Amino acid sequence: MTREEAIAAGMEVHEIQHSMKRRTPWHDYSRKGTYMLTLVVRERRALLGTLCGSLEGEKGPYVEHSALGNAIAQEEQKKIHRFYPQLEVWKLCIMPDHLHMIVRVNENMENGKHLGKVVAGFKSGCNNAYWKLFNMNEPPRQGLFETGYCDKILMNDGQMDKWTRYLDDNPRRLMMKRQNPDLFTILTGMEVAGEKCQVVGNRFLLNIPDKVAVIVHRRYTNEENARLREEWLACGERGGVLVSAAISPKEKEVLREAMNRGYNIILLRENGFPKLYKPSGEAFDACAGGSLLQISPWEFHYEKRVITREQCLHLNAMAERIAGYA
């Protein structure tokens, strides 16, 4: 259900809470659906397992579960279906300091039960396993996980497949981050093209002299677009950098092709970066490989905004300055 549908149905819609663990306020969590849940260990302590393997090895990176991680995988997650038969855990991914679960609610829950109570019960079981394994017999005792949790509502099978692949790839991405920490660090207040910006990625791309600004104007003919596309991709082929805000569909198309080919890209963003930001999908690999730099002249915000014409002009002007056009 969208926000507009919720309002039309007479439901109370609250303002977005500035928290990485916010719920969708107009969704009924007692109804059937598919969710990806994320629970983070308090203080991000690596209590659930150890990252092993290598990027070059035949097995690849993987997480070897600790005794606590094993207890969660072998005992606690199975209790969810035992206590709530209408729920199934379709996927469990345990990382050293957090875990993800894809949970399917096959039937509506009744008598005041909802997903939040399911998670609370699961966390309670994990707490008991944690206290037992660490000999924490006397109160006060802290829980294993941070307060709250994050959920993502999976609306279709395509999302399910995407997030299953994402969870399977988690150990590899973590190892890449650990091997390339500077490429995933958020820098604030860095001066770029005369502005204080937030940046993530390979900052040395700014020093490459061969740069082009990928900007497509409406007045361009098909022939002009084809010629410019060829010139921009040729710059990438020779080791140069494509600079763009990727606003229009044709700009996005060029940047997507450049990323598929492994070319250097500087991407300008309307939004900044949250505290625990990391790129996803192909952008993650590009960042780890040193071929991507993301820049935003604005602070991060949680609201879903439509980029304004003024912001488009601002970012395009920045792209031209970075490319040395102005």
Regions found by a protein language model. Name each.
Residues 186-326:
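Glycine-biased, small-residue-rich flexible motifs in mid-sequence functional cores and linkers
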Residues 1-186, 192-195:
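Short catalytic/metal-binding and nucleic-acid-binding patches
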